[in-house]
Amino acid sequence: QGWNWIGYIPQYGGLTDAALGTIVATQGDFLKNQNASSEYYEGFGWYGSLESMAPGDGYLLDVAEASGLIYPDFEEEDGLARKVVDVILPSKVSEWFVNPHAYEFNGSITLSVDNQEDGSGDYIAIFAGDECRGIAEYRDDYPWEGDQGIYILMAYSDFENGEALTFKYYNSERNEIIVYAETIEFTSDMIVGNGMDPFGLSRIARSAPEEYILSDAYPN
């Protein structure tokens, strides 16, 4: 119960849902590594950016109910299910890059864009000042019914808590960056929002490249 480090014993990788099949999972149970996360949704299973588990990786698991974890005997072809995709960012946001291993602490934020028509190829990044601390791409592949895109983001910091973080959104259709007024105070191992109830961005601070101020229309 609570956060526990778990190793991955099988010789081959496998999908997260299958790997954690023996756990008595409940709504909101959470798995993460340094790069991605997955959350348990009652009736749907594990879903998130951490779609598979692999040998050599370490994981943090947070569960409400204590239970035993026995990994399946995965075959080599199961490891092929692990998705390794090199994402090439649009040139306008090519500097939105973060090295997860450069920071001591991390946390998870699931976001939505509530005042824009977003879609495939869009991104949300989180910043401490001008330094990118995490980035996530639009996705709508969740297993439940819905019509809202979400962004599953890992945020990083060298401070265990208290660092102020801000958001920028890239709209690929308009090739436009929008700066939002919402902020989050970083806390190590935080879990903000989820796929069914994301943290919504709606208060525009300014839009690039014009960088005109919209404070009258969207007060802080």
For each feature predicted by the language model, list its residue ranges.
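C-terminal low-complexity, glycine/proline- and small-hydrophobic-enriched intrinsically disordered tails
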Residues: 201-204
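N-terminal exported-region signature
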Residues: 1-199
